[in-house]
């Protein structure tokens, strides 16, 4: 087993139609014949972003205009250890082509599961399929929940967790049915909190509370996230092959005034120890998105984060 780590910069590149660019590794290369996200190893003295710009120019002939951090993945193949520094690239000049003779394809995100990728790429696929915003839907009344749901949609939230801890039990079933109908109409992904006991309401998956995560023996079906507060919980979410985790609290929050906030650097240190997309939660506003991404988060999660009066 080698102790050297190969540091690679790679990109999830999207075109104007939302399609993702993938390329095929040469047959003679490590993990040959498999598909991957374009990129390559860092040269001496390069930053990951500098390497990304150079590699995409050399490999697929495009000039990167903007790039945002997506996820870092550490993987040990036995004969090779890699650190994949992955970025989202949505703005670029030029038309992609296989400069090194490699096959490439533009595919819809949902087609990623149809292609064979190296094992280290699997967390990247999870991150590529997730948005930057994760709304947690709560409210004290039916009207408040539905109003907040509409505000989430106006803020561009396309992934919602229905929690409803503050709503009277007798109202939860009816509200859940209404929210599900709204989400289906707007093509928004809806996860049900694991503590909700509802009949005949099937969302797109489940969000495990930290308590439910601790007792989980097998990954539930559908899209699955989990609430985490410690490295141990993050590692458990990773072990269960969940799609993502939510780490909290990052900043001081009025809803949990006694909870000690992690802060950005400790959050980053925790996230870098797991190969899993992780949303930042707690005391955050929309203006914190760039800070969250720069510190390794998938994006922002929140209740009040996406409400108009608190989003700036």
Locate each region found by the language model.
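Alpha-helix-loop-beta-strand connector modules within alpha/beta enzyme cores
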Residues: 173-194, 210-213, 218-230, 258-285
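Catalytic cores of alpha/beta
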Residues: 148, 190-205, 229-241, 271-280, ...
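NUDIX/MutT-family hydrolases
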Residues: 86-88, 96-129
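Conserved Nudix-box catalytic region and its N-terminal flanking loop in Nudix hydrolases
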Residues: 19-59, 70-71
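Active-site-adjacent beta-strand/loop module that shapes the phosphate/pyrophosphate-binding cleft
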Residues: 73-96
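Conserved N-terminal beta-strand and adjoining loop/helix that marks the start
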Residues: 1-20, 72
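Glycine-rich phosphate-binding active-site loops on the catalytic face of alpha/beta enzymes
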Residues: 164, 210-218, 244-258, 283-312
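Active-site mouth loops of central-metabolism enzymes
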Residues: 130-144, 223-228
